């Protein structure tokens, strides 16, 4: 008996540390095994968010008023004392045996108590196929960056599936309504239905389980998720389907929006909040959401988002009140989180909702703020008396490219303090359409709430670079100052959405500029400066070999330099064609194609820049070959045609989510450009009809010119249906490849 008791006691002693462990212990252990023993973590009550760095003997003390702020303090210490930068490209590090001491206590406070993360688009453009391992890293990243209020939209297709089954909808009806994995974001935003599906049952069970894990970890950290709410979405065939199923919801055409298109896709219907059936639907939605995922303090709803199908004479005040009332019925303490985007929020919403019941996300604060700073979306009264968050959008379509508005971001952030609306500024947010790019911009944004005094980008970049690489180097600093001054400093006069898009990813023409339809791109930096920065990085690459952050940045900066050089060569090639300079034309277009293949070769060295990482993530979520094929098709379509022929061409969605990645460069973009240049070559050689560029008979020119009648979609679709596997991990000697590629691209 005594032996049994001793054994039980010994077992409990072994298990006790895991029972007593805090989420901070788990975070530190995931960063580096044994790291939790190197810190003293102290939680102190405070009415204001803060973290402190201190020293006690040989151990570093990190103090804060909650786990998230303590994690933010750990991140600050790692960057500015230990020279360790945890980033999307590297969330693990080897800490020194003895941590560098904090010689003087350092304290940071913020009045921005809410720090938001994500855009609905992020859940499809970046996170569509993430598993728990990747989500665990992201939640750690959020905590380290002070995020305490993220959108948590995983698994909401499960809520809708259950609602429709309760209402008696058939499996086909459900499949026709709910979108596939790579397109769920736009279904949730009421833009399309069914595209990318049907989802197998295993998808729903996986997503439900994944969301529950995500929410559990967030709760451990004290992170409060923003869950999707209900604002009236119903299937576009709602009236017909309601007549076919057995339920007590009456049909009335007057309160259903007319069927509209979104870039060629049929939008779901909108059950107007003034309709009595709205309450029945919203009740079911919140019941099912709470049953699956629990009650939330915040719900995200964007009624009439990019919508033109609002019935004339609709009482918008009543609509907004009904949406808010439905949420409050589910949780009287809940707050509505709404995006400030385009025409939203409408004046009727500002008037209808009581201050304190809604939080607006100023989605594009660094470029198009609504709170008073000069912009095309400026509102004289901002968000009136409502609370709001200053947000960084930064990325569209998860496109690849160096980009930022450093001066504008810093200026706009500190400018808010001088506006009357600042009294209602309660938070900040990251609202990118796609993540895992330009880590420097998100690091800057997440530090702003913790820095009282305004600073210059030059001084901040100097500290960032030293922290990111764990060492100071004159040439590396010079490279980053060039980038900060040029490509990372898009000016206020420029209204473009996201990075300077790679010419490689454009559908070929004689007037290519941007790859996607709506980027509003315009030149704002000297394109030769990225090569200058790349040259400096390459010159010290041997010194930093094996440094994960440096190697990622080396590839990214050189990638940008090659893309910029290719644009210069493209312009030369077009000029050659227009002047019928056969010799130079052939030489220049071959140089363009050579640069494209060099880019493909370079990007093969890093997993983050390989299309196989994306397609393999998709396939790994499948439990059968049919599921793997469906998910791979979703992944391939999203980054190329986006939709069917009509949506890609007439709807202009093609290449919106283009990716400058290894694999797709060689197998998708190269054939497009090779085809185009060869057609022009036939014209310049007199083997095909051509009319002078700028001929007055433009209609005839378009009809007769084979370069303008290429069926691009017919070339593109086969790649989306293909199943040729791509490698997901980086291959080869990165530093040697970078040096070789730079020499081949720039000749010195």
Give the positions of each predicted feature:
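Bacterial N-terminal signal peptides
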Residues: 7-17
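Extended, compositionally biased alpha-helical segments that mediate assembly or anchoring
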Residues: 661-748
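Active-site-adjacent substrate/metal-binding segments within catalytic domains
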Residues: 112-131, 142
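Positively charged n-region of N-terminal signal peptides that target proteins for export
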Residues: 1-4
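Second-shell loop/turn segments in exported
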Residues: 59-64, 124-128, 201-202, 272
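Contiguous, structured surface segment used for ligand recognition
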Residues: 19-112
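Catalytic-core regions of glycoside hydrolase
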Residues: 85, 89-99, 118-122, 143, ...
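C-terminal substrate/ligand-recognition segments
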Residues: 520-544, 555-578
């Amino acid at each position: 008996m005594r032996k049994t008791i001793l054994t039980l006691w010994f077992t409990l002693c072994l298990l006790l540390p895991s029972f007593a462990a805090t989420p901070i212990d788990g975070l530190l252990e995931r960063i580096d095994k044994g790291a939790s023993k190197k810190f003293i973590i102290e939680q102190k009550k405070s009415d204001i968010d803060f973290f402190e760095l201190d020293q006690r003997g040989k151990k570093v003390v990190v103090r804060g008023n909650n786990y998230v702020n303590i994690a933010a303090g750990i991140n600050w210490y790692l960057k500015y004392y230990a020279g360790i930068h945890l980033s999307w490209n590297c969330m693990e590090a080897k800490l020194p045996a003895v941590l560098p001491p904090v010689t003087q206590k350092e304290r940071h406070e913020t009045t921005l108590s809410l720090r938001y993360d994500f855009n609905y688009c992020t859940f499809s453009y970046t996170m569509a196929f993430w598993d728990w391992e990747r989500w665990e890293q992201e939640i750690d990243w959020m905590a380290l960056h002070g995020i305490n209020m993220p959108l948590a939209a995983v698994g909401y297709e499960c809520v809708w599936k259950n609602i429709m089954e309760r209402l008696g909808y058939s499996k086909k009806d459900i499949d026709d309504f709910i979108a596939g994995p790579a397109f769920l974001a736009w279904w949730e935003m009421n833009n399309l239905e069914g595209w990318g599906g049907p989802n197998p049952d295993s998808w729903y069970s996986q997503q439900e389980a994944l969301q529950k894990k995500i929410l559990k970890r967030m709760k451990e950290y004290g992170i409060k998720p923003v869950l999707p709410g209900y604002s009236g979405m119903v299937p576009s065939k709602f009236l017909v389907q309601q007549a076919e199923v057995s339920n007590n919801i009456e049909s009335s055409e007057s309160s259903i929006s007319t069927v509209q298109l979104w870039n060629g896709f049929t939008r779901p219907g909108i059950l107007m909040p003034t309709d009595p059936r709205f309450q029945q639907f919203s009740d079911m939605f919140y019941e099912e959401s709470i049953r699956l995922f629990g009650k939330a303090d915040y719900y995200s709803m964007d009624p009439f988002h990019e919508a033109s199908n609002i019935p004339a004479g609709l009482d918008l005040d009543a609509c907004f009140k009904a949406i808010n009332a439905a949420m409050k019925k589910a949780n009287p303490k809940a707050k509505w989180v709404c995006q400030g985007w385009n025409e939203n929020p409408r004046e009727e919403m500002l008037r209808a909702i009581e201050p304190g019941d809604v939080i607006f996300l100023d989605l594009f604060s660094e470029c198009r703020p609504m709170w008073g700073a000069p912009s095309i979306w400026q509102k004289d009264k901002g968000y009136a008396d409502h609370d709001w968050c200053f947000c960084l959008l930064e990325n569209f379509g998860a496109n690849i490219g160096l980009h930022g508005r450093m001066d504008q971001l810093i200026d706009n952030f500190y400018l808010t303090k001088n506006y009357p609306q600042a009294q209602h500024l309660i938070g900040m947010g990251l609202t990118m359409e796609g993540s895992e790019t330009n880590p420097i911009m998100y690091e800057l944004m997440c530090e702003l709430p913790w820095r009282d005094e305004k600073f210059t980008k030059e001084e901040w970049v100097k500290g960032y670079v030293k922290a990111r690489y764990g060492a100071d180097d004159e040439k590396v600093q010079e490279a980053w100052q060039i980038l900060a001054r040029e490509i990372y400093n898009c000016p206020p006069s420029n209204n473009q959405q996201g990075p300077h898009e790679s010419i490689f990813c454009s559908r070929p023409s004689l007037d290519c500029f941007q790859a996607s339809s709506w980027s509003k791109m315009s030149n704002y930096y000297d394109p030769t400066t990225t090569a200058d920065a790349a040259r400096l990085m390459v010159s010290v690459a041997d010194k930093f070999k094996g440094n994960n952050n440096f190697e990622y940045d080396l590839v990214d900066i050189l990638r940008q330099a090659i893309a910029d050089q290719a644009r210069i060569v493209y312009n030369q090639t077009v000029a050659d064609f227009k002047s019928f300079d056969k010799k130079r034309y052939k030489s220049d277009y071959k140089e363009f194609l050579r640069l494209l293949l060099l880019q493909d070769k370079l990007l093969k060295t890093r997993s983050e820049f390989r299309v196989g990482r994306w397609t393999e993530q998709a396939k790994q979520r499948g439990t059968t070959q049919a599921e793997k094929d469906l998910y791979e098709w979703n992944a391939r379509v999203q980054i190329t045609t986006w939709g069917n022929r009509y949506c890609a061409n007439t709807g202009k969605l093609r290449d919106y989510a283009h990716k400058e990645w290894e694999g797709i460069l060689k197998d998708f973009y190269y054939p497009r450009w090779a085809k185009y240049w060869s057609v022009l070559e036939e014209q310049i050689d007199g083997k095909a009809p051509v009319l002078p560029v700028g001929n007055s008979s433009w209609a005839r020119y378009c009809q007769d010119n084979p370069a303008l009648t290429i069926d691009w979609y017919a070339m593109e679709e086969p790649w989306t249906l293909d199943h040729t596997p791509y490698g997901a991990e980086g291959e080869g000697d990165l530093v040697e490849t970078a040096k070789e590629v730079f020499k081949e691209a720039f000749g010195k």
